[in-house]
Structures are given as structure tokens and as C-alpha cells.
Amino acid sequence: MATHAKPELWRTEVGDAVAVLNIPGALQRRRTFDIDVSLVVRVPAENEEAWHELTLEVDGRRQWSRRIQSNCPGQTDGLDYHCRSVLEAGPAMRIRAVAGTHGSVVQRLLIEAREEA
């Protein structure tokens, strides 16, 4: 009787501008991951020209990038991105999120990869 492995969950959270998540390869099976990236920035009350941006790279290739004006002066604002990636049997996957800011300050940068069951 075959046993089914529990779906994998990989996660990293930093309070800095760069987060890296390495998912090791699996020799016996192909896996599909739902990848969520979340950036939260603190927006100063007095800065009307603040902006923040988020770039996602998978295995060194840019998958997505966006820059927006930071709203909610004196509070937090953010950017979120979701994608799905297939990891063939064998190789590992490296996910890198890079935040950029002007006026606002990175509070949290999170990458989460959940294996599809």
C-alpha cells in the first residue's frame, strides 16, 4: 500500500528588503507549489511621495515586479503576489523576493510555498 506524504509547506519571513526561500529537490516526484509573497511597509505620516515595490524571482529569473505609491500615511501599506510553480523531480527551487522603497520602510517581507495536495 502506497503512503501519501503530507503536503510540504516552506516559509520565510524577514524584516529586511531581501527574502530567500530554498526548496530542496525531491528525486522521486514532481511537485506543484502555490507561492505567496507579501510585503508590508510602514508609511510615514508626513511623506506624500513615498512608494514601495516588490520583485519576485524564481531560480534567478524575474517572474513579477510592481511599484506603487504608498498610501495610508502614518500606517502600513503593502503588496501581495501569488503564482503557481511546478518543480520537476530532481532539482531544487530558489525563490527570492526583493523590496524597494522610497520614503516608506520595510516592516515585513514574507514568502510562503504550499505544495498542492
Predicted features and spans:
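Intrinsically disordered, low-complexity segments enriched in small/polar residues
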Residues: 13-14, 23, 58, 72, ...
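Beta-strand-rich interaction surfaces with strong enrichment in secreted/lumenal proteins
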Residues: 7-12, 22-25, 67-70, 81-85
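Terminal beta-strand-rich extracellular "head" domains
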Residues: 40-83
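Solvent-exposed, conformationally flexible loop/turn segments
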Residues: 12-19, 30, 73-78, 90
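Short, surface-exposed binding/anchoring microloops in extracellular/periplasmic proteins
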Residues: 25-49
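Noncatalytic modules at the cell exterior or secretory-pathway interfaces
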Residues: 30-37, 84-107
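C-terminal interaction-tip segments
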Residues: 1-18, 24-26, 37, 101-117
